[in-house]
Every structure is written in C-alpha cells, then in structure tokens.
A protein has these predicted regions:
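Domain-level detector for long C-terminal conserved domains
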Residues: 1-133
C-alpha cells in the first residue's frame, strides 16, 4: 500500500505493462493505481507523480493520457501537467524538449557503474509530470 507519501515515481514500468498486458490491461492497472492514490493521499497535500518511460511509438508514452483520464475519473484534480522529452525527432506529442539530453550525473558516476549497470550517458525518455490535488 501507498501510505504517507506525496511523491510517486514510475520508471519504465508503463512500457513493460503496455507490452505484457496491452492497452486494456494497462487501463485496469491505471484505474487500480488511481483508486489507491485516492485512498492513501494525504489530506490537504498535493501529490507529485513523475513517470519516465520509452519515447517511441506504441510504448509507455502513448498510454500517459489513459492515466490522466483515470486520475480525473476517481475525482482528483490535476493542478499541473507537463509532458517533457529529450529527443528532437519522433517525439511525444505535445511535449516540451529539454535543452540538453546529457546525463547530468555523468561526471559523478564511477566507470565501474557505467560498465556494470549500463548507465546511459544520454537521456531519451518521455516524461509525464503531474501535480494532483
């Protein structure tokens, strides 16, 4: 259960679900998530939701509007919504591009981490940023 938090970050899970359970299964998961947010959201406190996912056709970015619909369906209001991207081509519709796609932590990441964990030097994700009240 989600209790006592006001920030939710979802990393590349949406595209996995999109492939595994399809659009209808993903809508059901979004519905479940939205209902749990309503049950566990702190009173009188906004909630920040940040979703990072693949920025390519028929992946997580295409399902972002489904999540927004479910948030509104359960009676929450979105006070802030931004769609962001790093790519300058074939990008997420309606999104704003970041000026730079270089990993801001690149100089701080030890070489062994880059090797062991395949740390990306450049970002190519699509982002949905929501403030829910």
């Amino acid at each position: 259960e989600i209790r006592g938090c006001n920030v939710i970050v979802i990393q590349y899970l949406i595209s996995f679900f999109y492939d595994a359970v399809g659009r209808n299964g993903l809508r059901r998961w979004f519905s479940y998530l939205a209902e749990n947010i309503v049950r566990n959201k702190l009173d009188n406190s906004p909630l920040l939701i940040i979703i990072n996912d693949a920025d390519s056709i028929n992946t997580g970015r295409d399902a972002f509007p489904l999540f927004v619909e479910e948030i509104e369906r359960v009676g929450l209001s979105i006070s802030y919504e931004r769609r962001r991207r790093f790519k300058d081509h074939n990008y997420y519709a309606g999104s704003l591009r970041y000026e730079n796609n270089q990993n801001v932590f690149e100089r701080e990441i030890p070489d062994r981490f880059v090797y062991d964990y395949c740390v990306a030097k450049y970002c190519e994700s699509a982002q949905l940023i929501l403030e829910v009240i």
